[in-house]
Amino acid sequence: MIVVVPDINVLVSKLYADKAAKSSTISQKVVLHLVSGSINGDPVQIAMSFKMLDTYREVLLRKEYPAALVEEEISALVDMMKFGPAGFDPHIVLGGSPDPALKDLEDGGVLATAYAAHAGVLITDNLKDFAGQDAETYRTSRVQAPDGKTRELYCVIRARPDGRELVIVHPADFISWIDREFKISPEAIRQAFAAIPQP
């Protein structure tokens, strides 16, 4: 089983794409894979904390999404967690205190949630805030942004408090790796990609 934490930015991006009547955007594909219940044959358990769901709710309400739609979105996420292979409940996956290694408290809370849920993968478009002195960073790919500029992507591997490791990946790499049936694991990443030296 793979425990995956989708960051709020991925979910918000998916909702923006839905609202704009787009289809097959990266964020939409990410959510579709998570909802499917399996990734390359492995069962998937979505994990989010109550605080993450509250933040998601606040962002959507601030963006003037109808309250009924917002509650529908939150309820759907809770159901996906509860009916996943591990049957997570966001009230149980508390996440604890934000990880002090991160400057941003919200990102620290997301990382703490991933640790508390024993997640193997965290998907975020906000990689730079999860990299740091105590993390390994690997160059993974280049993508073209909507403005035409090329963006170099990387992933981050962090040691969890339980001695296992967490892969923090950009949504575009997540989809590319699933499409190629690349195993999303620290070992596979270390073998396939070049490490970025720490400053």
Predicted regions and their residues:
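Short, well-structured N-terminal submotif of metal-dependent ribonuclease cores
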Residues: M1-M48
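Alpha-helix capping/helix-boundary segments
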Residues: V10, M52, V110, K128-D129, ...
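Short catalytic/ligand-binding loop motif for oxyanion handling, primarily in non-cytosolic enzymes
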Residues: S13-K14, T55-R57, F130-Q133
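Well-ordered, non-membrane alpha-helical segments in soluble/globular domains
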Residues: S23-V31, V70-E71, D147-T150
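PIN-domain endoribonuclease scaffold, especially VapC-family toxins
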Residues: S38-D42, A47-V93, D179-R180, Q191-P199
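Active-site neighborhoods of divalent-metal-dependent phosphate/nucleic-acid chemistry enzymes
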Residues: K82-V121, G132-Y138, A195-P199
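Short beta-strand and adjacent tight-turn residues that come in two discontinuous sequence segments
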Residues: T124
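Acidic, PIN/NYN-like endoribonuclease modules and their adjacent C-terminal/linker elements
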Residues: L127-P199
